[in-house]
Amino acid sequence: ALHQNYPNPFNPVTQIRYDLPEKSNVTLLIYDILGREVAALLNGEQEPGYHSIMWNGQNRSGQAVGAGMYFYSIQTGQFRQTRKMILLK
């Protein structure tokens, strides 16, 4: 399960929390409102349980992204869930 980020809206950092029922290969991506991938926060195997990861509002190149709505998406096998978050400047 993918939980709502906190804080939301955020500036400059937010925490993304998720639960895994079993050991899984996990991909966690950030997208802009046009569906373009902004950042990949996670791509690898994780143990079951409660996890959290921080996003600092930066893209893959380490540059700060602009204010606005973003989406974060988790995928594990056949499961995929997406939520929205807002970055304020």
Over which residues does each language-model region extend?
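Glycine-centered coil/turn sites that cap beta-strands in beta-rich domains
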Residues: 1-6, 10-31, 40, 52-55, ...
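Short, surface-exposed loop/turn motifs with a glycine/proline- and acidic-biased composition
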Residues: 23, 42-77
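Extracellular and select intracellular beta-sandwich modules with Ser/Thr-enriched
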Residues: 79-83
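Short beta-strand edge segments in extracellular beta-sheet folds
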Residues: 85-89
